[in-house]
Amino acid sequence: MNPRFKKLKILGWMMIALFSLSFTVYINGYRLNTSTSFPPGIYVIDAVKDVYQTQDLILFCPPNNNSVKTALARGYISQGRCKSQTTPMIKRVAAIYGDKVTLSDTISINNHELTNTTIKYQDSLKRSLIPFSLNGKSQFTVPYQQVFVYSEHAPSNSFDSRYFGPVPTNNIHGTVKSVLLIADVQAFIDALR
């Protein structure tokens, strides 16, 4: 057998094996988070629920609205398979149906201000950012079958419900938990040195 052909054959089988492994991992609910809203790493879909609660960490598709389209065009979020043409996001549920949200200088839920959640009106390139409002109001009650999400990991820089609004629960893929975080791998490598 020609040595060049043999190398191509091995490479082909390696590609098939890599694709098969990736597909198997994906269908079993494992997802790679590369954003900075939550620590980069591997997460797994833990549970799909009928009702989500505050503090649930969820994987979801953001709403298909102008705020999300603008964020995609500006490169805040990546293109993907959601109806909004974005990749799914990982965020924490901060408010659920019936909770009162106020978006003024910061995010407040039921009159309790969330730490470090300053609402920005310009991005780093001085382009306008418009906070979400429901029917023109910056104080609203989370509608039925929707949740309000944010990131406590990076609260001041997160593109979340303060800009794109509540997320319909049918956009939620499920709760997630971390399996392997990049910081954990780095700490392990540092410990070996």
Where are these regions (language model features)?
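Soluble "head" domains of membrane/secretory-pathway proteins
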Residues: R4-K7, I27-R193
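Hydrophobic membrane-insertion alpha-helices, especially the h-region
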Residues: L8-Y26
